[in-house]
Amino acid sequence: MESRKIEMERIQRLNEKDTVAGEYVLYWMQQSQRAQYNHALELAIEQANALGQPCVVAFGLMPDYPEANARHYAFMLEGLEETRDVLAERGIPWIARHGSPPRVALELGGRASLIVCDRGYLRHQVAWRQEVAREAPCRVVQVESDVVVPVETASDKAEYAARTLRPKLWRHLEAFLKDLPPTPLLRESLNLPLGGMDRAELRGAATRLQQGPDVAPVGSRFRGGARAAEDRLRELLQDKLSRYADHRNQPQTDDVSYMGMYLHFGQISPVYLALQVMGATHQPAKDRDAFLEELLVRRELAMNFVHYRPDYDSYACLPAWAQATLADHEDDPRSPLYTPQELESGQTHDIYWNAAMNEMKARGYMHNSMRMYWGKKILEWSRTPREAFQTALTLNNKYFLDGRDPSSYANVAWVFGLHDRPWKERPVYGKVRCMMASGLERKCDIRAYVRKVQELVQQAGR
């Protein structure tokens, strides 16, 4: 399927069925939860215009989404309400129904000429799209909009490290870093009788969703949605970016983008984000480059990882050398030793680690340099490396707003050697890289970070 404005490498046909004589073109929204810079949405509008039909957007609100809780649902619903309004301004109905995403897509897809979906990389997301492609009565087309360079275009295998993926990505950047202006819909479709939730039902949807563990929403500390993401981006471009390279490993500062949570829910486009940062030529080149390294190389390395390693959430995903060296040191004495429950309480002997855990619990976020230290100490203080892996992944997915994400799975696995190299052998860690409290004391004002978190926790409790 060709498009006038969307790169052909982003578009993938998922079944061998034809476009049929339906009533509308359906965009099944799941991963890319936005109305701007959304390649799947723009393709659906293009196709609707070509067929002389309306365009409809479907969304399934799943009551038991894998590992989701009240914190995740609240942030997502804030963004979805805004997306609904922006789509309405473009004459496009956003139809939300309770139910599994593929079932909702198939319900509305039964009257569609064509189904367009966005792309997700986790196992359940892949399985959902396969289900829709298999059961839909019409052609299903997937569009990749939550990476800059499509995963298979960047590489045809699981990459060893950032250094092996980086040159492959940079070769393709010019071809995929392109503006995506909105396509006007020729046939407005807001009055189609398709049901779905009204505004009041959407705002109350959280009460019907299974909220898993008791994890409170973060409230006003982080608001969901494209407008909030745009506000964060404006802060970055006008101020924080000028200190990004020097302060990205300084957890006591606030010179970070906070983009991870918005990228996770698809509330901002990585293409748009990259273009904005690259265009901020009033800011130092080293700071722009440091940010783009995280957004383009590290993030898309994580996408590569979960795409080519279906066991991304299993200890088996670790490189052979890491598994071997951790096995060699599995019986090393560990002191102190904490249970997963003791770690979750954030009451260890290490005040720096406790601060990181408490920040994570209070506001669903942790500075990236502290995420690394946090994970390394779980490895050091757990009964076995396998237990440590599961503890880190469980806490990560439970508390972080950007948990349950390809970057989260890659970050946890990095703690245990993924995308890294062997280091000097030492107890417990073997040849896996370690991190020490003395390193934090040497490289940053870690006690200022502890004080900052104490204030954040006090504010959260008010």
Where in the sequence are the language-model features?
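Trp/Phe/Arg-rich N-terminal binding region typifying the photolyase-homology
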Residues: 1-180, 184, 358, 377-387, ...
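Short low-complexity stretches enriched in small and charged residues
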Residues: 9-19, 69-74, 217, 227-230, ...
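Glycine/tryptophan-enriched, flexible segments
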Residues: 21, 150-152, 156-317, 444, ...
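Alpha-helical packing segments of well-folded alpha/beta enzyme cores
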Residues: 40, 79, 83, 229-236, ...
